[in-house]
Swiss-Prot record:
One of its GO terms (biological process) is leukocyte cell-cell adhesion. This is pH-regulated antigen PRA1. PANTHER family: PROTEIN ZPS1. It holds the Pfam family HRXXH. It is found in: Secreted. Residues 1-15 form the signal peptide. Residues 253-299 are annotated as: Disordered.
Amino acid sequence: MNYLLFCLFFAFSVAAPVTVTRFVDASPTGYDWRADWVKGFPIDSSCNATQYNQLSTGLQEAQLLAEHARDHTLRFGSKSPFFRKYFGNETASAEVVGHFDNVVGADKSSILFLCDDLDDKCKNDGWAGYWRGSNHSDQTIICDLSFVTRRYLTQLCSSGYTVSKSKTNIFWAGDLLHRFWHLKSIGQLVIEHYADTYEEVLELAQENSTYAVRNSNSLIYYALDVYAYDVTIPGEGCNGDGTSYKKSDFSSFEDSDSGSDSGASSTASSSHQHTDSNPSATTDANSHCHTHADGEVHC
């Protein structure tokens, strides 16, 4: 009898259906706030295969550079001697973090990088690319010159490059950061050109930290400097101005009055001009090159 009961129990247990509880992530309405969120920079089909390969790598490296600058700032804040050097001693780190985070994570579905010279400007001497203007505020043309002159982040600190003595646009990453901040959806009409050269950038940090955190080249020099120091040659970098840091330099600092903004607004606005090379430019994308204080024309 016991044997018969055992057989019946076994047969029932094998045949019994298994109930599985399944958790569904999607909301009942079908709404997904992450849908169509584009974090990478779109490239137009006008770029051929080799152009696409170079530009896509450059765009990825620019985001990598921005990501590290953001993370360095989150890790150390104003305790970082690099942060104080480029943005002053009395500056909150939140805005700097935000500018770099926009490059990393903001939606880029409206942005487009193209290789067709739609406005016939790549023929101009020295033009490696250009922003198309306010009527195409999220479009950037990359000219042929970029593809034969730009370097990659793996080459940082090589071939005589130093942060303080070399141009910021030698590398795809540095050049593209500059171009990103011209885009309305990334720069948000906040980031401008108040200081250009390394020396001017350091001066701006001490005279007007409010402008420094919104100065294109301050952000780019900072990103290159901390990447070189943290990643390329850890603990050493390749600044080139003879400055070295100890571990303790990242843990504390003495307050200084030199970070004050007092009386600096007029200096920054008058001494660091951002002008188009074509004064008759209109909003429908005439020349958007600009001449830096050292005479360099950036396109």
